[in-house]
Design a protein with these regions (language model features):
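Acidic, surface-exposed loops and disordered segments
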Residues: 1-201
Length: 201
């Protein structure tokens, strides 16, 4: 009787241990896959300058904006503002006047990343982090994007202001043309071990 009881107890314990081990292995595998996907997305990001005329779905636009707002922010002030521009006249006008944003003529939309100077004096740092998040989200969603600067060039800032109606305290950091890439494009391998220094330069 007791032998049967102990035998059953051993079997139950073995099952519990095996199940726990399998669950831990599964969690480890999921963590590995997640980290691999994140790192691959970072390394595969590229600046896209040629686009299809295909429109971008609203849920993807929302996903990019959420990614932007998930960026780190000094003292959690979150000084960013985002203007989603789909107006054809505005896109073409900015394309004509911004020297490195000519591709705006072929994209369905652009996101203008701006900073509120009344919330933070280092808004441009927080907004740069938000911009990178948007670029990475675009890559993950199968979209193309490129960072085109407005700040700190006063003439470019004025162009963006004229086309987006920004108040004086809101400064555009950059204009991000976004759309579906026109054909495959390969990311550059930018890693350079000569730029890495340990403890001292």
């Amino acid at each position: 009787k007791w032998n049967t009881f102990y035998l059953l107890l051993v079997v139950v314990l073995a099952i519990v241990i095996l199940k726990t081990s399998c669950m831990e292995d599964q969690k480890q595998d999921e963590a590995t896959l997640k980290s691999k996907a994140v790192l691959e997305n970072i390394s595969e990001r590229k600046s896209v300058r040629k686009y299809l005329s295909k429109s971008v779905e609203e849920d993807k636009i929302d996903a990019m904006l959420k990614a932007g707002m998930a960026a780190p922010s000094g003292m959690d002030r979150r000084p960013w503002e985002f203007v989603v521009v789909t107006d054809r006249v505005a896109l073409d006008s900015m394309a004509a006047k911004l020297p490195y944003a000519k591709m705006l003529t072929s994209v369905p939309l652009a996101i203008v990343v701006c900073g509120d100077t009344t919330l933070s004096s280092y808004w441009y740092l927080d907004c740069s982090a938000a911009t990178q998040n948007i670029l990475l989200a675009a890559e993950a969603l199968g979209l193309g994007a490129v960072w085109t600067a407005a700040y700190p060039y006063e003439d470019r800032i004025d162009v963006v202001r004229q086309n987006t109606g920004l108040p004086e305290n809101i400064v555009p950091l950059c204009v991000i043309p976004i759309g579906y890439p026109d054909g495959p494009q390969k990311a550059k391998d930018k890693f350079d071990s000569k730029r890495v220094h340990r403890n001292t330069y």
